[in-house]
């Protein structure tokens, strides 16, 4: 158990996972069990697509519960780095411009457990985050992306 993977995350990220876990345990799990009961009432289980779908969903829910419990148990809360406010670090938002065109992008660098690119939260394991971590406002950085290299200039860290 001592070698379990640790999951760096913000306090808010951990709270979000705890809320999802609570929902799965108190609401979703019961809904799925009820769907299984109803599907069993349809008779022969060998050709019962409703039963198969409900059992598949039950397996997914139970797997997600186990995964969330593990991530929460092994969460490492990211503390704000007040001593280096202009240095890119885990839990901070970084704004950069792509050079030479000047397109601006902002991301918050978080642990993989709470990464959500659609919300502007990228994993510290992503190529962009790896290139930016430890850098300062004003630094120009070459970032490796699936589409190739891009040069960026860090303009803000919050």
From Swiss-Prot:
Keywords carried by this UniProt record: Coiled coil, DNA-binding, Transcription, Transcription regulation
Keyword Coiled coil in annotation: yes
GO biological process, one term: DNA-templated transcription elongation
Residues in coiled coil: 10-75
GO molecular function term, any single one: DNA binding
Pfam family, one: GreA_GreB_N
Described function: Necessary for efficient RNA polymerase transcription elongation past template-encoded arresting sites. The arresting sites in DNA have the property of trapping a certain fraction of elongating RNA polymerases that pass through, resulting in locked ternary complexes. Cleavage of the nascent transcript by cleavage factors such as GreA or GreB allows the resumption of elongation from the new 3'terminus. GreA releases sequences of 2 to 3 nucleotides.
Family recorded in the similarity comment: Belongs to the GreA/GreB family.
HAMAP family per UniProt: GreA_GreB
Name this polypeptide is given: Transcription elongation factor GreA
Organism: Geobacillus kaustophilus (strain HTA426)
């Amino acid at each position: 158990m001592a070698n379990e993977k640790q999951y760096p995350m913000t306090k808010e990220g951990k709270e979000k996972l705890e809320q999802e876990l609570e929902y799965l345990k108190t609401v979703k799990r019961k809904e799925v069990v009820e769907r299984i009961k109803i599907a069993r009432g349809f008779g022969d289980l060998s050709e019962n697509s409703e039963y198969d779908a409900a059992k598949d969903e039950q397996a997914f829910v139970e797997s997600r519960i186990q995964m969330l419990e593990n991530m929460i148990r092994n969460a490492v809360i990211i503390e704000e780095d007040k001593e280096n406010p202009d240095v890119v670090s885990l839990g901070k938002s970084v704004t950069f411009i792509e050079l030479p065109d000047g397109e601006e992008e902002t991301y918050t660098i978080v642990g993989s457990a709470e990464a959500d690119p659609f919300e502007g939260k990228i994993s510290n394991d992503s190529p962009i985050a790896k290139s930016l971590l430890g850098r300062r406002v004003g630094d120009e950085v070459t970032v490796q992306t699936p589409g190739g290299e891009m040069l960026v200039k860090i303009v803000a860290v919050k």
